[in-house]
């Protein structure tokens, strides 16, 4: 499906829970400010089933921390049984060592691990948890079982800026495929922490100089730099960036049962909780959810637009 701004809808991003075992001071919480109402596995899979009718073929599972859901493996298996080409997950990696193999068997295709520091001290300052070594073990387990490409997310801020290039070195040594250097943006807890925002321009300019190839990714038109080692460095700058918004191809299912058309906005969401919890047959629910998707696509628009 194409929205009225010519943007294809290809990706469903599902928040499985707001609960997390870390306390990162900048967490954007997927732009959600509602209660931690947890949709059932059946609710999630029903929405995903309807989304397939709109040519959505990719699902990203997020949180909070998705590995805290006891039915995570079953959800992944259900999504693959629906025929999704790509099922991936973003995790803090704390429980990944124990879950990686089970998730791979269930059909998880690839994984993003949030790693915002390269030292135990900085890691604890950012997350509130002394778990750097445990997360590294989780990353190694993901690589070993074949959850590839393994991508590492690094939110750049004033507390970890000096570790960026050592982070690139660590990533190369670990054998990961790709890293994302992400701008801190004022969403969720990031609103309170935006004073820690750090401009990525100088970092990106240096990475471009040492790279052997520059690519532009279709999603969000993100710049990607291939280093001589083969590591891909993707720079993600969503805030006040109309180019980023012009390439957005996703819709979100919030933890409290809303179709959310933009990370930054709460004024153009479609509440589908009553449909999911209503006493309707599954056929009727599918029809009503289909209508909800149509409305969501109709009202979907870039938050940051080009000024003409």
Swiss-Prot record:
Keywords: 4Fe-4S, GTP-binding, Iron, Iron-sulfur, Lyase, Metal-binding, Molybdenum cofactor biosynthesis, Nucleotide-binding, S-adenosyl-L-methionine. Its cofactor is [4Fe-4S] cluster. It catalyses: GTP + AH2 + S-adenosyl-L-methionine = (8S)-3',8-cyclo-7,8-dihydroguanosine 5'-triphosphate + 5'-deoxyadenosine + L-methionine + A + H(+). PROSITE patterns: RADICAL_SAM. Its EC number is 4.1.99.22. Pathway: Cofactor biosynthesis; molybdopterin biosynthesis. PANTHER family: MOLYBDENUM COFACTOR BIOSYNTHESIS PROTEIN 1 (PTHR22960:SF0), MOLYBDOPTERIN COFACTOR SYNTHESIS PROTEIN A (PTHR22960). Belongs to the radical SAM superfamily. MoaA family. This is Probable GTP 3',8-cyclase. It comes from Saccharolobus islandicus (strain L.S.2.15 / Lassen #1) (Sulfolobus islandicus).
């Amino acid at each position: 499906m194409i929205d009225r701004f010519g943007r294809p809808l290809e990706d469903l991003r599902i928040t499985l829970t707001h609960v997390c075992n870390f306390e990162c001071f900048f967490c954007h919480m997927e732009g959600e400010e509602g209660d931690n109402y947890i949709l059932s596995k059946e609710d999630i899979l029903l929405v995903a089933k309807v989304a397939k009718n709109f040519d959505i073929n990719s699902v990203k599972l997020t949180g909070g921390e998705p590995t805290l859901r006891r039915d995570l493996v079953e959800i992944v298996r259900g999504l693959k049984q629906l025929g999704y080409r790509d099922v991936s997950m973003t995790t803090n990696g704390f429980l990944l060592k124990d879950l990686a193999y089970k998730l791979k068997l269930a059909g998880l295709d690839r994984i993003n691990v949030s790693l915002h520091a390269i030292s135990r001290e900085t890691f604890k300052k950012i997350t509130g948890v002394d778990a750097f070594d445990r997360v590294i073990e989780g990353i190694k387990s993901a690589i070993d079982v074949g959850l590839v490409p393994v991508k590492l997310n690094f939110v750049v801020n004033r507390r970890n800026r000096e570790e960026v290039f050592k982070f690139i070195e660590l990533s190369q040594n670990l054998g990961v495929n790709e890293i994302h250097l992400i701008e801190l943006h004022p969403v969720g807890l990031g609103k309170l922490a935006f004073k820690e925002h750090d401009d990525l321009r100088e970092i990106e300019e240096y990475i471009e100089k040492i790279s052997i190839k520059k690519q532009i990714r279709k999603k969000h038109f993100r710049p990607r730099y291939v280093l001589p080692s083969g590591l891909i460095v993707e720079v993600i700058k969503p805030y006040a960036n109309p180019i980023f918004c012009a390439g957005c191809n996703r819709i979100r299912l919030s933890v409290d049962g809303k179709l959310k058309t933009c990370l930054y906005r709460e004024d153009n969401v479609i509440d589908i909780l009553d449909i999911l919890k209503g006493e309707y047959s599954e056929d009727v629910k599918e029809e009503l959810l289909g209508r909800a998707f149509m409305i969501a696509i109709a009202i979907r628009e870039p938050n940051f637009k080009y000024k003409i």
